[in-house]
Amino acid sequence: MNLHEYQAKALLRAAGIKTPRGIIIKNSVEAKEAAQQLGGNRWVVKAQIHSGGRGKAGGIKTAQTLDEVHHISAAMLGSRLKTEQSSADGLPINEVLIEEECRAIATYYLALTLDRPRQQIVFIASMAGGTEIETVAETNPEAIIYAGVNPAIGFSPYLSARVGGALQLDKSYQLPLTKLMNRLYQLFIDNDLTLLELNPLIITEDHEFLPLDAKISIDDNALFRHQELVDLRDTTQEDHRETQAQELQLNYVPLDGTIGCIANGAGLAMATMDIIKLYGGEPANFLDVGGDATSERVKQAFKLILTSSRIKSILVNIFGGIVRCDLIADGIIQAAKEIDLKIPVIVRLQGNNVDLGRKMLDECPLNLQAADDLIDAAQKAIAAAQ
């Protein structure tokens, strides 16, 4: 689950980390009042969406008058912002953050994330602050510093010494950096985060560390113990199909292809996508109905996939271990009848009650085809999508 910038900064402040003063608004009428309340003569108007690259896309603008604050806010609110990291349709701007402008004497990148290959939490830092870290990793990878946290020890000052040295910080900043990194680490652990990114992290004219932007992602599997964070969820920023899939307990990720995929088990779902790619097709989604799939869940999976207008065929790949193939076949048939399915569905069944399941599909008058094996299924699905 992702948070908006203003929500992430609220968590930072609660952890004792200073952030720029700002006020969130939901309509442009509030814009001037917010700027007046902040004071000063320059403000930053920031669209709140769950995507990086807002600045390049025009989602972060500086205003020098109260009228400018109002006009920029009015133009943003209610519109959609498309960035390099968002979908083609962009994301709706329902809220705008008005912040005081802060001047920097130095700019950095600092983040905490999970390093799965190393099986540890890792600090990532760079002197190339304010730019997308993915771009830095591609063009200048030696500019990125990694400092892994030993899970048996937790945060230790040597980590900040290593990061401070790599960032060529003056020794006077070492203690503030240690305090900052320690608080970030505790925030990361206490809230089961998967990403905590400060970009840019600046040193102000008052010689203080200050995050101008903050991004936080929370482990969905840990949300059951963080109801206060669940309440911050903004479903308008999420693909409605993914939200619906979560409610149905389906693991779903939309893609750009034309062949819908349904499988039971994440590994089998990935193998199904791989075999489609291998034979020249393009999967339209990842969809795992789970090892204990029921006919009802399969029916809901069909409905979910068909919300995409790009789908030209569907490949169902089921291994009947715990689940019976005849129950899956029944779910497919019921879904096809209820939805009035017009596109070809290729079904590969293997395992428990497979013969009965295939028999049910063969006897069904609808546009359902049983496949002998996964290769046969992939080739039929690709041919049907042509």
From Swiss-Prot:
Mg(2+) binds at N199, D213. GO terms for cellular component: cytosol; succinate-CoA ligase complex. It holds the Pfam family Ligase_CoA. It is an enzyme of class 6 (ligase). It comes from the Bacteria. Gene3D superfamilies: ATP-grasp fold, A domain, ATP-grasp fold, B domain, Succinyl-CoA synthetase domains. Keywords: ATP-binding, Ligase, Magnesium, Metal-binding, Nucleotide-binding, Tricarboxylic acid cycle. Heterotetramer of two alpha and two beta subunits. HAMAP family: Succ_CoA_beta. Belongs to the succinate/malate CoA ligase beta subunit family. This is Succinate--CoA ligase [ADP-forming] subunit beta. It comes from Dichelobacter nodosus (strain VCS1703A).
